Amino acid sequence: MQTNTTRDKTIDFIKGILILFVILGHTTLGLTDMYSFDDTMNGIANVIYSFHMPCFIAVSGFLYSEYVGNASQGIFSRICHKAFNILLPYVMISVIYWIIKFALSNLIREPVAVSSLISIPWKPIEFLWYLYALFLLYCVAYMVDYVFARLLPHFNYKMELLFVLFLIIAFTCYGSFHYEGFNYIAGFQMYFYLGCLIKKWLDKLYNRYAVLSLAVMSVLVESSGIVLQDDMSSNPLCSSLFERLTACIVTVFIFAVSYFLSGYCDFPKWLQTIGRDSMPFYAMNVIFVGGIRIILNRAGITNMALQCICGFAGSTAICWILYECIIKKIRLIDFIFYPGKQLHIRK
């Protein structure tokens, strides 16, 4: 089993890779909205969105599983800590993002309603749904832990049971609630517990080649699913099952390959930095992706490949520069993304 130091670096690497997928996803999605006829951009966007957010949620579950059963904190205290570390940044970033969109509404030709600002507590603005959902997923996990600790304290297959339970809930309940928060829980809690399971599996795999075999197995399972995809597409239930299992399998593959490689090479420091301090990159990239797209369109540059490359590379570079030159050095701005750190509240 690997040391905690190696493990932290590997998780930072995984998060860094996922942030790059987030930026690329926002770039391709924007181009898809603009050029809906382009099959290439649609395909890239569909592939990215099939796994990158479930994998991000699995990372949170992976990290969470290290603190399961921590009796030093009560459930209320744990939820309050997450409120400072996730919910407070969600509110501040949402308000700032709304103000920016409102100020640039004429330029982006998209109406910005005051109602979207008022509804932030129950209806997230665009991409910020992830932070809102993540807080709810943690709350559910804390409450479930509380129940299990009192009713089944010695039950060894809690994570497996919860993963299967929320997989069933995803099929039966997702999209049926008026309140979006319940839909987030129904649709994504299973990936949170998938991350917990991955942590449990990796702790039992002492040999790097056993980890590699897990990656190979995930590829074989996914390949067989792709072969049968056409037969399953006619059945909505089978199609939904394929989509969710694809997200799970790709997530397992990313973890397994990353941990296998961690024993043979050092991950790029800049990618670990993006993963370690992912919040500013996640929050800012949409603005710069959209800005670059507007500038290129006004300059008469409509080539899809060029727009995609410029949007992805440009927004990543701008986010990096702002992070290194401003966010890290000005505590007030850093507070927007990491209030818990500034207030010395642990995660």
What are these regions (language model features)?
Residues 41-53, 118-133, 173-191, 225-253:
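Interfacial loop-to-helix transition and helix-capping segments at the boundaries
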Residues 1-167, 265, 273, 299-347:
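Membrane-cytosol interface segments of multi-pass membrane proteins
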Residues 121, 144-238:
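Aromatic-enriched alpha-helical transmembrane segments of multi-pass intramembrane proteins
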Residues 185, 205-272, 287, 302:
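Alpha-helical transmembrane segments and terminal signal-anchor/GPI-anchor hydrophobic tails
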Residues 60-64, 136, 140-144, 190-202, ...:
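Transmembrane alpha-helical segments
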